[in-house]
Amino acid sequence: MYLLNKTPLFLEFLKRFMNKAGYVFEDENIQNKLFLHSKCNCKQKDCATVYLYSKKPFKEDSTGINIFNTNKGYIIVHILDEGYFEFEALLYKKYPYKKEIDKFFNKNRKIDKKVPKLKNKIKKISDKDMKKIDDYFNDFEILEPNIIDLGEIDFNEINKKD
């Protein structure tokens, strides 16, 4: 596992998105609670999925899956009670942190259970990169979910056929 401090773009993106989505962290310094575990290896150009890990398992009432349909793509937050946290970002080629995460995990980094020593210092984000994040969130919207009404299902009717 690796410190979130090593990926300042992703850390800033994560903080801003989670704030907009209504998630509240007890500790504002989420970089001291969540660690980079790995990234998705699907190799799709529009996938920017990152897997995180928390030393302390999540409370049962905070676990689950939330799907956010945004004007910039889909973001799926999947929190598991074992301490894993999946931040799945799909269908948008310009997530500001994608290159940073790809580069970070492209160095043949091992996936291990060793939790790194905490450091408060976060790598500084360049003005250019901060502008990318600002531009991304400037017109960012969480849209109403796309729901398809399939009508009612009569489970009694299904049981009769079996």
Language model segments and positions:
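N-terminal domain-onset segments
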Residues: 1-63, 99-162
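Amphipathic protein-protein interaction modules
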Residues: 45-101
